[in-house]
Amino acid sequence: MTVEMRLDAHPRTETGRGAMRRLRRARRVPGVVYGAGKEPQPVALENDQLYRLLEEEAFFSTILKVQMGSETEQAIVKDLQRHPFKPLVQHIDLQRVREDQPITVHVPLHVHGEEQSPGVKKGGVLHHDLLDLEVVCLPKDLPPFIDVDVSSLKVGQAVHISELTLPEGVQSAALQQGEEYDAPVVSVQATRKTRGASSDDEAESSESE
C-alpha cells in the first residue's frame, strides 16, 4: 500500500547565495518546482519535515502532494543534495507531474528468496548489482517497489532486468534503449568455499567414472 506523502512549500522571491544562507540558518531548504508546462517556482521547505520523509524508502518513488499556499501540486523528486555530515538538506528539485504524461523514476528493488537460493545454500554470496530500477510509466502506474525473486539462483547465475516482472504499464528505461542494456540486477557469486566444493564434486565425479 502506497503511503501518501505531503510537503509544505513556501513560494520565495529571494535568490542568490546570501538568500540561500539565510534560509538554511532558519532550517529551511531552498528548492524549485518546475515542469508540466508551467514556470519554475522557487520555494522554501521545512528541513525537519523533509528529513522525516527521507526516512521512507519510497520517498523518491512516490507522487508527492506539494502544498503551496492554497494550491496543491503533484510532483516527484528529481534531485536532492544533502549536507556532507549534518542532518540537513541543501537543495531539492521537484518536477511537476501530469496524469497523462509518462514520468521517469528510480524505484527500489525488494529482493526475496535468498534463503532458498541453491547458490547461497552452497556458500555463495548474493551480490546486489542494482539497488533500484529506473522505470518509465504514467503517474497512476508508479509502483512503490519492484520484487526480485532469487530463490532459484545457483552460483554464477544472475537475474537480469529483462527477467523482472514489472507491473502493467511500467517499462524499464534501460531496456527502452536496447537489449545491450539488459544489466544484471542481482547475482550469486562464488567464494573460496564454493570453489572448493565445486572442485571436490568434480573429483568425486571423476573417481566414480
Curated annotation (Swiss-Prot):
Keywords assigned by UniProt, alphabetized: Ribonucleoprotein, Ribosomal protein, RNA-binding, rRNA-binding
Region (Disordered): 175-209
A Pfam family it matches: Ribosomal_L25p
Gene3D superfamilies given in the database record: Ribosomal protein L25, beta domain (2.170.120.20), Ribosomal Protein L25, Chain P (2.40.240.10)
GO terms for biological process, alphabetical: translation
Record family assignment: Belongs to the bacterial ribosomal protein bL25 family. CTC subfamily.
The protein's role, per its UniProt record: This is one of the proteins that binds to the 5S RNA in the ribosome where it forms part of the central protuberance.
PANTHER family: RIBOSOMAL PROTEIN L25/GLN-TRNA SYNTHETASE, ANTI-CODON-BINDING DOMAIN-CONTAINING PROTEIN (PTHR33284), RIBOSOMAL PROTEIN L25_GLN-TRNA SYNTHETASE, ANTI-CODON-BINDING DOMAIN-CONTAINING PROTEIN (PTHR33284:SF1)
The protein's name in its UniProt record: Large ribosomal subunit protein bL25
